[in-house]
């Protein structure tokens, strides 16, 4: 269990934000035999191994230096004598990364991998599709110093790229499908998911920021795609990757040991989750939690306690990457008045009800189903990219309710509350307690 301990003896509403955070990996909690038993180091899409350290500008692996090397290699086909560093490229099409699947049989679950290609292969394959590769089309993702490699992403509109790969069985697959198909116990899979999420967010941002918001002129990439700049000489506005902050909160009725869960009309049947909403300009995180809870359910919130955060690059394409900021919020009033324009329903649920929703949802079964779907897509058997996230009991009976899977921060907020003693979440010794062990 990943526990976040805040070293303070009291909880004034604002002071917890400045407390030191210590990672304690010693505690584990098992929900039931039906749930997965594993420890997560980070949320899905966090923990990108390419983002841990950005080299200094003088380093050959830095964005600036790597980009200069890239420009010398683009006009020619690199060969084995290419100087360090080498380059790998991850192609995307319509927000979907290139992947391949391996290892699936009657007894084992297939495993998906990112479909990295060499710079030389990328150029040749794109040329065969009538697409010219240039330095402005590539976005810097980061280096792996131990492998002497720098990683890039490129956005393609041509599905013909895949057919040129021949027998390699690669395909562009929706990131949401890969998210569900990732084995949460496999650090490699979580690392690749984080890399793909970061790449998609950057590429989508480039797609929606092609024109200057100040003067309307075209923008062009700078610093290996890490920012953009207006092409108008009198404007020259700098534009940086967009991140949309969202508060997501589990509202708790401390006196009656209940949690408030809600449904939106777009949810699959029987799924319940936390309240969430975008932060408005000039608003603190705590104020956003209280406002969103009041607007959507009519419930007043008092104390607000931070849990953890998660990048979320699988939202609408108009928002390339949301940052989900998770909180526990403690209710001052209990009467629910649902805003039907925002929610389909909201209800208080007892700890036991929520625990059952965690226990009966076969998250591992969903992961295996999604992994098999990725394999079928890569083989060309399955063409649909849609994926049901509904879960059933092993007996085939429908569970009365379930919550989002371990790939979502909502799962960990809810599971952290379920597995704590009633007073622990708001104890004077710790807050923001855990990414649950599943």
From Swiss-Prot:
Enzyme kind, highest EC tier: hydrolase
GO cellular component, one term: chloroplast
Ligand binding (substrate): 240, 276-278, 292, 296, 342
Binding site for Mg(2+) 2: 292
Residue intervals of the Nudix hydrolase domain: 241-371
One Pfam family matching this protein: Zn_ribbon_NUD
Residues noted as binding Zn(2+) in the record, renumbered to the chain: 212, 215, 230, 235
Residues holding Mg(2+) 3: 292, 296, 342
Keyword Chloroplast: yes
Short sequence motif Microbody targeting signal: positions: 422-424
Localisation: Plastid, Chloroplast
Catalytic activities: a 5'-end NAD(+)-phospho-ribonucleoside in mRNA + H2O = a 5'-end phospho-adenosine-phospho-ribonucleoside in mRNA + beta-nicotinamide D-ribonucleotide + 2 H(+); NAD(+) + H2O = beta-nicotinamide D-ribonucleotide + AMP + 2 H(+); NADH + H2O = reduced beta-nicotinamide D-ribonucleotide + AMP + 2 H(+)
Cofactor names: Mg(2+); Zn(2+)
InterPro entries associated with the record: NAD-cap_RNA_hydrolase_NudC, NADH_PPase-like_N, NudC-like_C, Nudix_hydrolase, NUDIX_hydrolase-like_dom_sf, NUDIX_hydrolase_CS, NUDIX_hydrolase_dom, Znr_NADH_PPase
Residues spanned by motif Nudix box: 277-298
Positions contributing to Mg(2+) 1 binding: 276, 296, 342
SUPFAM superfamilies listed in its UniProt record: Nudix
GO molecular function per UniProt: metal ion binding; NAD+ diphosphatase activity; NADH pyrophosphatase activity; RNA NAD-cap (NMN-forming) hydrolase activity
Mutant phenotype after disruption: No visible phenotype under normal growth conditions.
Tissues/organs with expression: Expressed in roots, leaves, stems and inflorescences.
E.C. number: 3.6.1.-, 3.6.1.22
PANTHER family found in the cross-reference section: NAD-CAPPED RNA HYDROLASE NUDT12, NUDIX HYDROLASE, NUDC SUBFAMILY
Its job: mRNA decapping enzyme that specifically removes the nicotinamide adenine dinucleotide (NAD) cap from a subset of mRNAs by hydrolyzing the diphosphate linkage to produce nicotinamide mononucleotide (NMN) and 5' monophosphate mRNA. The NAD-cap is present at the 5'-end of some RNAs; in contrast to the canonical N7 methylguanosine (m7G) cap, the NAD cap promotes mRNA decay. Mediates the hydrolysis of some nucleoside diphosphate derivatives. Has a high affinity for NADPH compared with that for NADH.
NCBIfam families in alphabetical order: PRK00241.1 (NF001299)
Name of this chain's protein: Nudix hydrolase 19, chloroplastic
Organism: Arabidopsis thaliana (Mouse-ear cress)
